């Protein structure tokens, strides 16, 4: 077991605090431009690969991690199999079981393969759609405090774009907390 996996397990189980957490490594960044009717966002999608060790009860571990970092979990399920976005909330998807192909950015967007232990942070307006998934695929969805998600399946009107602009920047990264990558990467 490497140091990152060991320390990540310590953090995820609550044995270690956030200071010095190996989860603070740099996530992959996807910069998505408007695509057809999908508005997307100038803020990057953040993909944390293998950020949470895969252990029994991983969904509980993901929920505790997100809660600890100020992103209260709101559901466990999958990802819709239709293109959509949220205009009123940023969203974090913690992949708790299985594997899936997710298209980001709308039709003809970017397809990413996600596995249990990965995390994706989607800024408001980011198109996403499940292309395929294993039978055991499970996701924990969470949002910053006081953000209530909607589901948009059509082109953004001026009112929808204004709602997206008003969504606040989160105070912390759902994976690595206040000192994590998100507050540094999502600035304007």
Segment roles from a protein language model:
Residues 4-20:
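N-terminal export signals
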Residues 16-84, 178, 183-188:
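A short, N-terminal "cap"/entry segment at the start of jelly-roll beta-barrel domains
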Residues 87-101:
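Short, conserved beta-strand element in jelly-roll/cupin
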Residues 90-94, 112, 119:
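His/acidic/aromatic-lined binding-pocket segments of jelly-roll/cupin-type domains
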Residues 105-108:
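Short alpha-helix capping/helix-loop boundary micro-motifs
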Residues 114-133, 143:
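Conserved metal-binding segment of the jelly-roll/cupin
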Residues 131-188:
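Double-stranded beta-helix
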């Amino acid at each position: 077991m490497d140091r990152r996996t060991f320390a990540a397990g310590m953090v995820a189980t609550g044995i270690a605090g956030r200071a010095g957490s190996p989860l603070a490594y740099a996530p992959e960044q996807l910069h998505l431009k408007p695509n057809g009717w999908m508005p997307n966002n100038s803020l990057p999608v953040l993909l944390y690969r293998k950020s949470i060790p895969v252990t029994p009860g991983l969904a509980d571990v993901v929920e505790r991690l997100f809660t600890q970092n100020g992103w209260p979990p709101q559901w466990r399920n999958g990802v819709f199999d239709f293109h959509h976005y949220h205009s009123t909330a940023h969203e974090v998807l913690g992949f708790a079981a299985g594997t899936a192909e997710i298209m980001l950015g709308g039709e003809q967007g970017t397809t990413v393969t996600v596995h249990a232990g990965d995390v994706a942070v989607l800024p408001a307006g980011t198109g996403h759609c499940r292309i395929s998934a294993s039978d055991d695929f499970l996701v924990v969805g969470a949002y910053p405090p006081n953000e209530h998600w909607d589901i948009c399946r059509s082109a953004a009107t001026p009112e929808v774009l204004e709602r997206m602009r008003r969504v606040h920047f989160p105070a912390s990264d759902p994976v690595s907390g206040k000192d994590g990558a998100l507050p540094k990467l999502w600035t304007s």
